[in-house]
């Protein structure tokens, strides 16, 4: 099929959450570097101010009338249900206006899998549409199978006593029932309804996934067979086109602090943009970190401690504990931190972006997942890639100390570090010329130019 001239426009639709905005903006920059013009369609909930990385991009707002309080009041799952209903008509109007302005220049619509309202608008205007998955291929496969597994009573332990949740799920080794991507912010029924919409490829012509074959070859093969449309694993995108995409202000003073620390001596603690902790969990974590005798850099996001704006309601002993070995910031430049030679481990919620960024720098992990696909990622880090230690159950100082010392001091951690460096080399090889992700990206770009 003949390629059309470069410079055609791609419309990308982003989910208003940090973990989704970062990869879709990296994808946008990647496509822009390949010669495509870029339009980002976003809602008022994104709060994303274009940086110098995106001066050539067009940003348009999808009109909607949801109260701004819905983003926090409803929880992520119910909010996404409501947002998709609200934007279904308004995005058609928005896309119609873009077509009037751009004419035949628009090649396709690429939408985050959780913004599935975009598919109907693309279909109405006879535009090709592409699903973009910001989670792992394994998590995508789990979501696809969720309905069937639940109907066959295989996942019923999710509603049963915790002991039964340790049962392995047939054909999904090493995942247990409790590792399946369940949200703690919504009912099982509401979450399953969302998954039905996200995994329904409808009229999608292809799927892009921010992953690499060296990490998930079997899950990618399974997904390709299941979807029967092209699946393009083109990640990790942060290694292809790094971009400034943080919704929160990054405190770079922590880099100066890291510069004073010894190689591999610091455990970096950051639990993402959504997770919440109880005050007692914060105290237990601090005591465990202190008892481990390791230096630590800790991100405590404003609003992440229940009942507190930041850390002002924590006991006085907290500041005393921290002042000895630690450094606290409200938000950190994560990729820069993980690439710093002083960082020897990452205590993480195991969101997919954080997982890829940590592997991409050869940093082993302590895994404390909170919800959704984080549980899948944590299980794979520990049992498949063998570069992670999962902390399960309630947080207490003893568990924190043991996990940190296993990773940072003991021989077990050194083995993980060697495996992490090996995976880092494989990941970086995948995105350069001749690598699997590079080749997949070239195939996708060729496909886009034939539309």
Swiss-Prot record:
Higher taxonomy: Eukaryota, Viridiplantae, Streptophyta, Embryophyta, Tracheophyta
Binding, UDP-alpha-D-glucose: 273, 332-334, 349-357, 371-374
EC numbers: 2.4.1.-
Keywords: Glycosyltransferase, Transferase
PANTHER family: FLAVONOL 3-O-GLUCOSYLTRANSFERASE UGT76E12-RELATED, GLUCOSYL/GLUCURONOSYL TRANSFERASES
Family: Belongs to the UDP-glycosyltransferase family.
Any coiled-coil regions, as ranges: none
Functional summary from the UniProt entry: Possesses low quercetin 3-O-glucosyltransferase and 7-O-glucosyltransferase activities in vitro.
Organism in which the protein naturally occurs: Arabidopsis thaliana
Gene3D superfamilies hit by this protein: Glycogen Phosphorylase B
Domain of life: Eukaryota
Protein name: UDP-glycosyltransferase 76E11
Keyword Glycosyltransferase listed: yes
MF terms (GO), sorted A to Z: quercetin 3-O-glucosyltransferase activity; quercetin 7-O-glucosyltransferase activity
